């Protein structure tokens, strides 16, 4: 019962941001972060590299888990899959760049490279971009 109370407290903080719990492939809790601290997640073989902000610096956390599994766990969050190797946090997307048929996402965090969007995710990402741009100040480039 106490554990349940802690989980409920951990899901939201004062600013209505929520905490995201990252579990490894064995479903063991490894890392918990406020949603607005996560910039993007990149897959690397059987690992995911979580890029997040800590003391105004972007740092990495290596998690043994698949991007597919993480995308299922995070489906109701602003963190969306945009490529077979990437998930992005729409809380940090500054712009969506369309060059011919290629789409890429640019972040509002210094020193972070833009992330490509696979053609298979184009519609979903455009939909998410419109949805989140109403909440934040994004622009189409």
List each model region and its residues.
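Basic, polyanion-interacting recognition surfaces, primarily
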Residues: 2-141
